[in-house]
């Protein structure tokens, strides 16, 4: 049975997910059997496990870092926002249905029970479970409905590391204030503080660290530098973060829909070329590649796209031979029509797509396809001809059925007669080197450039683990873990 370590934050986006990823790899390298856990995750970015369960992609990434197979128990409750205070609720990897906030909170006790049962089941197979919290640890307006932070740590008697983000300023106040807002009995769970995303010389923090330790009675166990590593991220807020300089002079424009989902599809590209996310009220400019990503609500985002200048820009670029690629909801939007019986938009309606691919998508039942897939490249044209017959892998998470007579990947997707407009339901397709090479090679050739595949880089999980391990008091953290009785 397992011991626990819980990582909570002073607020959202302080770096909890990436620190849990690092800790999973660090503990794995120390010989522990490790798994991640997040009771409740709110994200439109998800991963499909081997058995077809849907979990937050952050937990899948953390599992990979731990050398573990992603499982539904690692993220028992996934909330996928759809707008209008409504989220699709995914429980143990399967969609339960759409719920408004009030409806969801009515079932919060049962959700806590589900989360604890999943954690205990996971604990049977691992030595250490690294638990990630959600949002801020001391949201006092939600404390009685919180299943992911201090109430969970209290239930499992787990030591807590509290993380603050110095990059955004006010880290001492946020760490002190978070502890001060916790009920006295719960403050004792916080055993260590982590100052994250520090740039510069740690000695510049001066007496601040000592004063913080004196005020809180909790030791600072790490001052972690900003790394800039491209580990897949969870929240769309990270799309505005700093990006490293691209290796290729290829400009890739990704349409940033209001309800964008699975934007991690493009993080493999970000390590190779210049990727920018373009909002609907901006202009695409003259990119070398245009990508329409997945959407949590195709109907809503398609309507907004068509009412924006980007719709005509996409069509114009496509007619000029610029590669246009749609993934999942983006694929559906590239077609002739989207026929909705009320599943997506609430009312039956038919919406014209961009008309760039000869497909029609029909939403006629509340049924989601979730599976891992391996497809054979069957499409023709300049993007696919060079890799025709090869295999590509990915995963599908979508509602609606799309039919075509010009499939790109066996029974999936569609490719235009020109061969430069492509749609697919495969998330993660850019993780296939052969496909990515083919697309980038064509984009380079159009610019008169020679495409040279970037040389391999070191495993980013080990690189991240090295950075974090050198910046934390790992011995103290391991003592926290080992001091617990096994559950």
From Swiss-Prot:
Keyword list, A-Z: Cobalamin biosynthesis, Glutamine amidotransferase
Entry annotation: catalytic residues: 328, 427
Every GATase cobBQ-type domain range: 249-435
Any one Gene Ontology BP term: cobalamin biosynthetic process
Function: Catalyzes amidations at positions B, D, E, and G on adenosylcobyrinic A,C-diamide. NH(2) groups are provided by glutamine, and one molecule of ATP is hydrogenolyzed for each amidation.
Assigned protein family: Belongs to the CobB/CobQ family. CobQ subfamily.
Name the record gives this protein: Probable cobyric acid synthase
Organism: Methanocella arvoryzae (strain DSM 22066 / NBRC 105507 / MRE50)
Annotated gene: cobQ
């Amino acid at each position: 049975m397992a011991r626990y370590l819980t990582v909570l934050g002073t607020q959202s986006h302080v770096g909890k997910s990436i620190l849990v990823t690092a800790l999973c790899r660090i503990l794995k390298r120390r010989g522990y059997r490790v798994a991640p856990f997040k009771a409740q995750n709110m994200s439109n970015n998800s991963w499909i496990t081997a058995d077809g369960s849907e979990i937050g992609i952050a937990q899948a990434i953390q599992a990979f870092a731990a050398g573990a197979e992603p499982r539904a128990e690692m993220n028992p409750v996934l909330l996928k926002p759809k707008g209008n205070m409504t989220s699709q609720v995914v429980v143990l990897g399967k969609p339960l249905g759409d719920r408004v906030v009030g409806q969801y909170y009515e079932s919060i006790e049962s959700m806590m029970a589900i989360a604890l049962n999943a954690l205990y089941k996971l604990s049977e197979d691992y030595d250490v479970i690294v638990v990630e919290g959600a949002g801020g640890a001391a949201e006092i307006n939600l404390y009685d409905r919180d299943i992911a932070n201090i109430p969970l740590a209290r239930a499992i008697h787990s030591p807590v590391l509290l993380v603050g983000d110095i990059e955004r300023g006010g880290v001492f106040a946020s760490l002190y204030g978070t502890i001060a807002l916790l009920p006295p009995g719960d403050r004792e769970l916080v055993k260590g503080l982590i100052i994250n995303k520090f740039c510069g010389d740690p000695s510049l923090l001066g007496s601040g660290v000592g004063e913080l330790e004196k005020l809180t009675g909790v030791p600072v166990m790490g001052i972690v530098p900003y790394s800039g590593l491209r580990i897949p991220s969870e929240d769309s807020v990270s799309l505005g973060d700093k990006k490293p300089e691209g290796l290729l002079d290829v400009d890739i424009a990704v349409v940033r829909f209001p309800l964008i989902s699975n934007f991690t599809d493009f993080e493999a590209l970000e390590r190779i070329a210049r990727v920018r996310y373009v909002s609907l009220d901006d202009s695409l400019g003259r990119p070398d590649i245009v990508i329409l990503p997945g959407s949590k609500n195709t109907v809503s985002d398609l309507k907004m796209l068509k009412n924006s200048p980007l719709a005509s820009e996409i069509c114009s670029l496509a007619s000029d031979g610029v590669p246009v690629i749609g993934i999942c909801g983006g694929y559906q939007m590239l077609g002739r029509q989207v026929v909705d019986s009320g599943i997506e938009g609430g009312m039956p309606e038919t919406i014209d797509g961009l008309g760039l691919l000869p497909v029609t998508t029909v939403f006629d039942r509340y049924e989601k396809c979730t599976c891992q897939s391996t497809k054979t490249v069957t499409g023709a044209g300049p993007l696919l001809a060079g890799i025709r017959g090869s295999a590509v892998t990915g995963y599908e998470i979508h509602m609606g059925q799309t039919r075509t007579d010009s499939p790109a990947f066996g029974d999936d997707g569609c490719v235009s007669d020109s061969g430069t407009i492509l749609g697919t339901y495969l998330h993660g397709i850019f993780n296939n080197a052969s496909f990515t090479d083919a697309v980038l090679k064509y984009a380079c050739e159009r610019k008169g450039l020679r495409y040279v595949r970037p040389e391999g880089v070191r495993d980013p999980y080990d690189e991240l683990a090295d950075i974090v391990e050198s910046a934390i008091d790992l011995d103290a953290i391991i003592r926290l873990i080992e001091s617990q009785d096994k559950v």
